[in-house]
Amino acid sequence: MTERKVKLDRANKSILLRALGDVYYGQRANGGSTEVTGRLILRVNDLPAGGKLTMSAAEYRLAKAALNQLRTQRLAEGGYTDAVDDALARLLRAHTPLLLW
């Protein structure tokens, strides 16, 4: 399983929580499983500002999709996407930890 580490400052953490919250409430309204999304929200919320978040491949895909969804929503509303773009760029630059054997 590949993991990715991303450093989140206060603004990126807030935007990621907003995006994941929208996905969580959408899943809940549709009667879907919210377990994975809920756990990721709690992990991001417990992270100190400037801390590094380690995500599995599934969590990475979920966070990326959530940020893309929030960006699309803001574009449709005619709002600014600067903060979402920054959080998405930081997430996309997340690296896999180097394992030395």
Where are these regions (language model features)?
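Positively charged, low-complexity terminal tracts
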Residues: M1-W101
